[in-house]
Every structure is written in C-alpha cells, then in structure tokens.
Amino acid sequence: MPSEHPFSDGISTLNPKETMNDTAQITASYGRRYIVRTPDGTTYEASTRKKRVDFACGDRVRISPVNAEQVVIEDFLPRQSLLYRQDAWKTKLIAANVTQLLIVTAAVPSPSVRLLQRALLAAEAAGIRAVIVLNKADLPETALWREKLKFYETLGYPVIETRALENAGSLRPALQGHSNILLGQSGMGKSTLTNALLGSQTARTGDISAALDSGKHTTTHARLYDLNGETQLIDSPGLQEFGLHHLQAADLPRYFPDFRHLVGQCRFHNCTHRAEPGCAFKAAAETRAASPERLAFLQGITDELPG
C-alpha cells in the first residue's frame, strides 16, 4: 500500500473478495468519509453511493468491495436506535445503535443547562438510557454545579463524578454491556475520559484518528471503540446547540419524567399547558409539585417545533 495513503495504518491490504464479510460496522465518520470494520476485525476506508449522508457512527451496514483498501456502503441494517439533532435548516446524525448516552459536563468552562436538558429530551425520544457525568469534580467551582445536578437525579438520571485521568475507571461499571456515547460541550473532557478508559488501545487507533482529525487535538468526528466484547464507546465532537425539530409537540410531555404521569389528566385533550382551565401541568407547577422552570422549558420547546 502506498505510504501516502491517509488511512494506511490499520487498513487491510488483503484481497477483499477473500476476506470480506458483506456486513460491517461504521467505527468513524467524517463528512462523507467513513471507516468500517468487518466481523473479523478488518477495517476499510468507505464511501457511499450517490453522496448519501444518512449513515452514522455505530451503524451496521452492508458493504461491497472497491479494491483491496476501500469499500462502498450500500445501506444500513435495521437500527436499534438513532440519536440525532435537527434545527430549521439541517439534520445531523450523531450515532446509531447506542443504548446509553453519557452527557459529560463540568463546572469549567461554563456548563449549559440548555444543552443538558435538550440532550436528555433527545435520549428519551430515542429510547436511550441517559447518564450525567460530572467531570473535573475536584475543581472548587464544582460545588454549585453539583448542587444543580441533584435535581436531575430526582428525575431518575444517574450522576457519576469523575476526574478524568485520576478516576475515569469509576465510569466502567456504568458502561458495561452498553453501546455508549459521550456527548457534551467542547472542553468538558470527553476525549480525555475516552483516552483514560481506552489505555493502550489509544495508540492502536491513533493513526487512523490522526488522519481523520487532520492533526487536530480536538475531536472533529465521531469514533467508536471496543472496551471489551460487550461494551462499546463512541467519542463525539463537542456541541453548543441541540436542535429538537425532529420531535412532535404532542409527544413532548412523555419525554419529561416529571410530567409524563400527568399526560391525559388535563380537562382538554389538546391542552397547551398554558392558560387553559383544568390544566394538570399548570396546577402541578403552581403547587410546586413540579418545577415551574421545567414547565416553562416544555412550553418553550413546544413553541420551537414546526406545525
């Protein structure tokens, strides 16, 4: 294989017709460029037909050989889940077939409650278990943010504290047996946590990662790693916004653990949970049985959604 090939390290040079299964999993995605891995562990650079971009890291796909180093992705196999975001202009696929979303947050730099709440909604809508990771927990600035996160624990979302290099291992029991994805703002330490969890595997995947990242130290694309035979981990690029235009307004209350038990209890079936008489949501907020701020958040998201 020519040494200048950007994916030369770790990519098979064997005859694909002799070694390739017709299925694979996407282990890295970068625009329209992908890395896929077949069941026997062989990796290939992959492209798509007709410039398709509806594939995500974690997808299990059907492939066809192009040459000894490259394959074409023909289609994806049925998905267990799909995590994505959508605003008024575009849809961005994040990961497929994940069973657990770990939202990595920290007191420094300034954490976004908006992003946290939106990511939790997206996980609920996709049927994905959500966990909050409080990273950099040893920083003195953490105390106030830790207190704010206690509210989400009351909603049933576990909060796990980490200090990246020192005790990333505290995450391992929560990761075990899941297809996991780390998601959060830039600077929260997702990639540092990933490297600490991977250990020596980082060196084995480093060359391909460097080729995809063009030498940058920040994650610019999603990458999937095997922690063991039962556990996978996807590191994803940092986010600042999480559009939810793919959700339906009528379904939103079911994605709120603090409001879903009130669904169907309003006097009017088409209640907007604002000024209508007999609104169970408004009554709960007025009596502090539910958070008024959370009701305002529900109303705000409803206003954003088309139709």
Swiss-Prot record:
Residues 85-242 form the CP-type G domain. Its EC number is 3.6.1.-. CDD domains: YjeQ_EngC. Its cofactor is Zn(2+). Binds 1 zinc ion per subunit. It is an enzyme of class 3 (hydrolase). One of its GO terms (cellular component) is cytoplasm. SUPFAM superfamilies: P-loop containing nucleoside triphosphate hydrolases. Zn(2+) binds at C266, C271, H273, C279. Keywords: Cytoplasm, GTP-binding, Hydrolase, Metal-binding, Nucleotide-binding, Ribosome biogenesis, RNA-binding, rRNA-binding, Zinc. GO terms for molecular function: GTP binding; GTPase activity; metal ion binding; rRNA binding. One of its GO terms (biological process) is ribosomal small subunit biogenesis. Gene3D superfamilies: P-loop containing nucleotide triphosphate hydrolases, Probable gtpase engc, domain 3. It is found in: Cytoplasm. It comes from the Bacteria. GTP binds at N135, K136, A137, D138, G184, Q185, S186, G187, M188, G189, K190, S191, T192. Belongs to the TRAFAC class YlqF/YawG GTPase family. RsgA subfamily. One of several proteins that assist in the late maturation steps of the functional core of the 30S ribosomal subunit. Helps release RbfA from mature subunits. May play a role in the assembly of ribosomal proteins into the subunit. Circularly permuted GTPase that catalyzes slow GTP hydrolysis, GTPase activity is stimulated by the 30S ribosomal subunit. Monomer. Associates with 30S ribosomal subunit, binds 16S rRNA. This is Small ribosomal subunit biogenesis GTPase RsgA. It comes from Neisseria meningitidis serogroup C (strain 053442). The gene is rsgA.
